[in-house]
Amino acid sequence: MTEYLLLFVGTVLVNNFVLVKFLGLCPFMGVSKKLETAIGMGLATTFVLTLASVCAWMVNSFILLPLGLIYLRTLAFILVIAVVVQFTELVVRKTSPTLYRLLGIFLPLITTNCAVLGVALLNVNQSHNFMQSAVYGFSAAAGFSLVMVLFAAIRERLAVADVPAPFRGSSIALITAGLMSLAFMGFTGLVKF
C-alpha cells in the first residue's frame, strides 16, 4: 500500500507531467482561461488517462508481448487512446451536455494530448504491473488536473489585474507557468525513487 501511495504522491507533486515533464502543455495553456472549463477538462482527462493507461497495459501485456509485436506499441497505444476518447465523448455528451458544449473541440483533442500517450509509454518502460499502471495513470491525471485548475484560477485573477501591456496575454501566462514549475520543485525531496 505504501508503494502505491509513494507512486501517487511522486507522480502528482514531484514528477508532475505538465510542470516537470512538459507533457500536455497544449490543453494546459488552451483550456485554462476559465476555471469551470479547466475543471471539466481535468475530469475528462482524468477519466481518459486512467482508462487509457490500464487499456494500454492490457494491450501490451496480452497482445503485443506474446505476439512479438513490440514495434507496434506506439501505434497500438494511439488506437487505444482514440477509442477511449471516443467512449468518453459519448459518455460526456449523454450525461452532461453543458460540459460537452464547454469543452467543445478540446474533448476530441485529448486524443492528441501527448500526456496520455506519454503515460502509456512510461508505464511500459517502467515495467509497471496492472495496479501500478492504474495508480500511475490516475495520479498523472490528478497532477495534470491539479496544475490546470490552479493555473486557471491564477489566470482568472490575472485577467482583472493591472498587468503591464507587454506582459498581457500569453506572456504573463508563460511567466506564471514557470513560477508554478519553480514552486513544484519544492516537492523534489519529498519522495525518493
From Swiss-Prot:
Topology in membrane: Multi-pass membrane protein
Predominant subcellular localization, coarse grouping: membrane
Spans through the membrane: 5-25, 39-59, 62-82, 102-122, 134-154, 171-191
InterPro entries noted in UniProt: Ion_transpt_RnfA/RsxA, NqrDE/RnfAE, NqrDE/RnfAE_oxidrdctase
EC number in record: 7.-.-.-
Listed GO biological process terms: electron transport chain
Assembly information from the UniProt record: The complex is composed of six subunits: RnfA, RnfB, RnfC, RnfD, RnfE and RnfG.
Gene designation: rnfA
Organism: Yersinia pestis
Function recorded in the entry: Part of a membrane-bound complex that couples electron transfer with translocation of ions across the membrane.
Keyword entries, A-Z: Cell inner membrane, Cell membrane, Electron transport, Membrane, Translocase, Transmembrane, Transmembrane helix, Transport
Cellular component GO terms held in the UniProt record: plasma membrane
Highest taxon, organism lineage: Bacteria
Family statement drawn from the similarity comment of this UniProt entry: Belongs to the NqrDE/RnfAE family.
Compartment annotation: Cell inner membrane
Name of the protein described by the UniProt record: Ion-translocating oxidoreductase complex subunit A
